[in-house]
């Protein structure tokens, strides 16, 4: 009987932890959204750094990637020449990750960024 109660408590606790983690990410993303609406790019950068570190600690690649992309976007607003730094960071992340799925997603994202950049250059050259 006691074993059954202990198992129930453990199972309930395991079900509660992910829900609490998701709520904390949701709360942080709501803060990011509000800062973005108020045109506070430095606040967005600070919050996305926090989300990235939290995702890294919890091994939550999806949150890490979302935070990294938002950070890149707002970092470009603050420092226009930071695009290449962000792209290099993505490339390093793709090289260092041990997860094949994460690596595939990162490589696909990097390829899309390069394709968009090439298209932008091509259309601007064609206009000249």
Predicted regions and their residues:
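Non-membrane alpha-helical segments in proteins
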Residues: 29-37, 51-53, 62-77, 108-116
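Helix-turn-helix repeat elements of alpha-solenoid scaffolds
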Residues: 39-49, 79-89
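Conserved positions within tetratricopeptide repeat
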Residues: 45, 65, 84, 104-105
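Residue position in alpha-helical solenoids
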Residues: 54, 93-96
